[in-house]
A protein has these predicted regions:
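Metal-dependent phosphohydrolase cores
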Residues: 1-160
Length: 160
């Protein structure tokens, strides 16, 4: 899918989310390396649409995009060393779901995407195709974002 069509779909289905106070707050939190939670969520939505296009089955693109944008809607800096976020990987999906339900009307698919995107770290598997797609898109984006940081650090170390 070409970049313009992906961007159009993200804004078609998620403009209210992107403009929300919570998503604006996500711009202040780092997710992986120098990537903000906001940018990570956008990347996951983009990657989800790319993966969905490869599926021969019907995909609810609206739920896919909205769930992807909100999958990390936990709204805190998990890098803070206060001890309160030590098990972030295990618990942030429920926090994200709580915040998303407070701020938006979510359908079953969107709720499942947010709650289960950390599978298999969280042991209950996704129920819907859309949830599986966002789960994989999140893993792919996180790996890319994290390895970019490691690659840069390794390059700087190697150069002395």
């Amino acid at each position: 899918m070409e970049a313009n069509r992906i961007e159009e779909k993200i804004y078609k289905y998620g403009a209210d989310i992107l403009a929300s106070e919570g998503m604006q707050k996500e711009k202040t939190f780092v997710q992986h390396g120098s990537i903000t939670c906001y940018d990570h969520s956008l990347r996951v939505a983009e990657k989800s649409l790319e993966l969905a296009e490869k599926c021969s089955a019907y995909i609810d693109e609206r739920s896919l995009v909205r769930g992807a944008l909100l999958h990390d809607y936990f709204l805190y800096d998990w890098h803070e060393k206060d001890g309160g976020h030590r098990l972030h990987g295990f618990f942030h999906a429920e926090r994200a779901l709580h915040n998303a339900r407070r701020d938006f009307n979510l359908n079953f698919i969107e709720r499942d995407i947010i709650r289960k995107h950390m599978f298999p770290l969280n042991i209950i598997p996704p129920k819907f195709r859309e949830s599986w797609i966002v789960t994989w898109a999140d893993k792919l984006c996180a790996a890319e974002e994290t390895t970019r940081v490691l690659r840069l650090a390794f390059t700087k170390t190697a150069r002395g």
